[in-house]
């Protein structure tokens, strides 16, 4: 129409399958239509909106049931969860040499366990949803578990020097590292339960934690490296805690004194090399800066 311009703020939608759903529960999305121009006050039809619906021809596997779920873990590639899925007794294994990117699609996946193979170099990525499971990795440095933007109802792993990255996650129950796991927490992380540290862990970004427990360590010199905005409610040390196990605080802000454990026990908390601490401020926050 002369004298009038119009546009949508979003012209394409990627919707989950509506198969086996009622109309009122079918997936939806919205877009806004804006108009401008000198003819905006005229009272007449401005045009026709055409909606084209096409099937998804990508290489992403839609997971609707346990059979689809097993197939996704038997094959590499990409998968997306179509609906909430409960596999309480389902023990999933990612096969040797396979990589899987699994988009939980804001849905909930509940399974008994997920494991990586005994001899492979797999990368498993879980993103954008809620999951409750036990993850078992099997001691190869080439294995990677990446959990991105997820709520975790308990995450533990039997893990020997494999690599685990948690990014922008909320963990509702206990989270622990065991048998040499190398963990990296990035972005915004909120653990409402207890985090138990046995081996090397690196945390960077905004991190909120109810209880941090450093348990008995019988070998090695595990280090917990912190940087970013760190808020920890309670520190807990096992009775046989070794002085060699260090908590190292880098640049960032802390709600505890980051250069000593305030009860004086073992002196397990220290500043990273080249850092200084100031504070606390009126809110009890200490600031660590790198020189």
Question: Can you annotate each of these PLM segments?
Answer:
Residues 1-74, 78, 187-188, 204-206, ...:
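Extracellular/surface-exposed low-complexity segments
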Residues 1-6, 11-13, 18-21, 26-31, ...:
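Solvent-exposed loop/turn tips at the surfaces of repeat/solenoid architectures
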Residues 94-98, 197-198, 219, 282:
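A short, compositionally biased
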């Amino acid at each position: 129409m002369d004298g009038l311009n119009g546009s949508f703020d979003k012209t394409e939608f990627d919707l989950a399958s509506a198969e086996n759903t009622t109309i009122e529960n079918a997936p939806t999305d919205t877009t806004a239509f804006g108009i401008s121009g000198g003819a905006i006050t005229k009272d007449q039809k401005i045009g026709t909106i055409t909606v084209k619906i096409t099937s998804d021809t990508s290489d992403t596997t839609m997971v609707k049931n346990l059979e689809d779920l097993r197939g996704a873990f038997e094959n590499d590639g990409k998968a997306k969860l179509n609906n909430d899925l409960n596999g309480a007794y389902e023990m999933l294994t990612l096969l040797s040499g396979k990589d899987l990117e699994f988009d939980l699609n804001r849905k909930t996946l509940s399974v008994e366990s997920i494991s990586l193979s005994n001899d492979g170099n797999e990368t498993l990525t879980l993103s954008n949803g809620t999951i409750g499971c036990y993850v078992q990795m099997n001691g190869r440095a080439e294995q990677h578990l990446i959990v991105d933007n997820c709520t975790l109802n308990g995450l533990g792993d039997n893990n020997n020097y494999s690599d685990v990255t948690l990014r922008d996650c909320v963990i509702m129950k206990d989270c622990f590292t065991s048998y040499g796991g190398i963990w990296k927490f990035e972005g915004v992380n909120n653990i409402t339960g207890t985090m138990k540290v046995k081996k090397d862990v690196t945390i960077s970004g905004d991190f909120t934690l109810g209880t941090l427990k450093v348990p008995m360590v019988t070998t090695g010199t595990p280090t917990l490296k912190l940087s970013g905005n760190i808020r920890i409610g309670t520190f807990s040390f096992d009775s046989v805690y070794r002085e060699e196990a260090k908590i190292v605080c880098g640049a960032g802000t802390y709600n505890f004194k980051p250069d000593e454990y305030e009860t004086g026990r073992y002196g397990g908390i220290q500043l990273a090399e080249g850092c200084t601490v100031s504070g606390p401020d009126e809110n009890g926050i200490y600031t660590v800066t790198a020189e």
